[in-house]
Amino acid sequence: MGSFSITLGFFLVLAFWLPGHIGANPVYSAVSNTDLMDFKNLLDHLEEKMPVEDEVMPPQALSEQTEEAGAALSSLPEVPPWTGEVNPPLRDGSALGRSPWDPSDRSALLKSKLRALLAGPRSLRRSSCFGGRIDRIGAQSGLGCNSFRYRR
């Protein structure tokens, strides 16, 4: 009980003593007002020396640039406007009356790909009760969880 009261007393002293010594110190307090004024004068001086963009490029040069861009875009093939339809037009399977990605075809394709992934050698290695390195050791010694899968 004595050590608990000493520890509690120590934490109480720290709780009341530290807030006076630890506080938020803003970053700007480290910079003096004269430094801030010097920085502001430097920025004003740089703004005076920097030309305004409208003065740098006259309107005639801007119109020439837009004409050049329009000529470059006119050589591209025209894209038909969007009609608002969600489904794309039928392509290969339109003669048969069904789309090339019929739901039954898609599910059969997905099932076959999933079976191929699960039957692959890498997925068989991952279906163990230990890590891959321990399974390789177990496969060589015949003591691992899935040692029957690794014998070749």
Curated annotation (Swiss-Prot):
Pfam families referenced in this protein's UniProt entry, alphabetically: ANP
Site (described: Cleavage): R122, S123, C129, F130
CC per GO annotation: brush border; cell projection; cytoplasm; extracellular space; glycinergic synapse; mast cell granule; perikaryon; perinuclear region of cytoplasm
Positions of region (Important for degradation of atrial natriuretic peptide by IDE): 146-150
Disulphide bond pairs: C129-C145
Phenotype caused by lack of the gene: Mice display increased arterial blood pressure which is dietary salt intake independent. During pregnancy, increased blood pressure is observed, leading to late gestational proteinuria and smaller litters. Impaired trophoblast invasion and smaller spiral arteries are also observed in 12.5 dpc embryos. In 18.5 dpc embryos, mice display fewer trophoblasts and smaller arteries in the decidua and myometrium than those in wild-type mice.
Modified-residue entries (Phosphoserine), positions: S128
Biological-process GO terms, alphabetical: cardiac muscle hypertrophy in response to stress; cell growth involved in cardiac muscle cell development; cellular response to angiotensin; cellular response to hydrogen peroxide; cellular response to mechanical stimulus; cGMP biosynthetic process; cGMP-mediated signaling; female pregnancy
Sequence similarity: Belongs to the natriuretic peptide family.
Protein's name in the database: Natriuretic peptides A
Record organism: Mus musculus
Lineage of origin: Eukaryota, Metazoa, Chordata, Craniata, Vertebrata
The encoding gene: Nppa
